[in-house]
């Protein structure tokens, strides 16, 4: 049986000997896998996207909201309420039920530190993304990703990247052509 690469998740500040690691179950996933509801995941390998279905027009469209790379953690709540989590590539994750996470908070108050850290990171990232979307053009957003998050450009398929910055794939191609 494989074990979690704890160094990859050292930013969570959980001791290597902490029994919490034993509660995670290994999940190998393939491309286009939809992750189960009411669980938290640690991504060890692969790439996962979070998206919403926009059905305000005649055609349903997918709007990419976030991406998760190795070392990231994400939680999936009730189906559809918080978006859909789908793998972009095959990979490996570690899962734990949200009920088990709640139990850990009761048994071990130190887990609250991890929760607070995770929530503050999520809030800061959401606020930063909102400001980027409000204050910048799609070309500015693409240039920001080029300079600050090149791993997005290198790893995320263009159709998902276009959705993330709020343009069509054709518009993204034009932006890329103007920049180069």
Please describe what each predicted stretch is:
Residues 1-28:
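Cyclic nucleotide-binding regulatory module and flanking cytosolic helices
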């Amino acid at each position: 049986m494989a074990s979690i690469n704890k160094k990859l998740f050292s930013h969570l500040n959980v001791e290597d000997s902490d029994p919490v690691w034993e509660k995670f179950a290994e999940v190998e996933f393939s491309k286009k896998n939809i992750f189960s509801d009411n669980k938290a995941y640690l991504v060890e390998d692969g790439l996962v996207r979070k998206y919403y279905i926009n059905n305000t027009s005649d055609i349903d469209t997918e709007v990419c909201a976030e991406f998760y790379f190795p070392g990231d953690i994400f939680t999936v709540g009730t189906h559809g309420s918080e978006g859909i989590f789908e793998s972009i590539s095959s990979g490996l994750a570690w899962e734990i039920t949200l009920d088990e996470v709640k139990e850990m908070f009761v048994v071990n108050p130190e887990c609250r530190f991890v929760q607070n850290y995770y929530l503050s990171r999520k809030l800061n990232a959401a606020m930063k993304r909102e400001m980027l979307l409000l204050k910048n053009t799609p070309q500015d957003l693409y240039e920001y990703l080029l300079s600050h998050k090149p791993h997005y450009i290198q790893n995320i398929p263009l159709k998902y990247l276009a959705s993330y910055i709020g343009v069509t794939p054709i518009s993204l191609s034009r932006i890329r052509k103007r920049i180069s």
